[in-house]
Amino acid sequence: MYFFAPCGFGKTTVANELLKNKKYIRLSPESGEITADALKKADIVLIDDMQRMESEEERQCLLLSIRENPQKRFVLLSRSRVPGWLMPFQVSGLLVTVEYDELFLSRSETAAVFKSFGTEPGEQEITDIFKRTFGYPLAVTLTAREISRKTAYD
């Protein structure tokens, strides 16, 4: 599964919720953690910041692991679209993509975020907030946080 969206769309939050109560490993290309040995440690592998995977060696390790382990599940998070070297998996249907437009919050989800911060604005305020934020998760969360701190809504 490949999630791609700009910063603040909740890719990591969605992945954490998806993998809740599952045994998995979390790897990052920035720290050089993507090795053949690391990829063998669990049946579910989460790799965040895929857009930073510049090492050909890491790419080859990941490709080999995907090809040789059909039972293994990969959750890949990125700020950019599926790179060319992963396209064969997408075209064949083995790699499901979740794009940014699927991560926008609905009006009811926006209201739920506010409730999780211990505040429940009125129906008109929620509608106004939803229109202003377009359901962008980071904007909704920051607004909910500020309102929960008793900052006046403007």
Where are these predicted regions, by residue range?
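Conserved catalytic segments around the Walker B and adjacent sensor/switch elements
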Residues: 20-34, 43
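P-loop NTPase Walker A phosphate-binding motif
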Residues: 6-25
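Short hydrophobic/aromatic beta-strand immediately N-terminal to the Walker A/P-loop
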Residues: 1-4
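Sensor-1/coupling segment of RecA-like P-loop NTPase cores
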Residues: 52, 64-90
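Conserved AAA+ ATPase core "coupling" helix
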Residues: 104-114
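Conserved P-loop NTPase "ATPase switch" module shared by AAA+ and STAND
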Residues: 37-58, 77
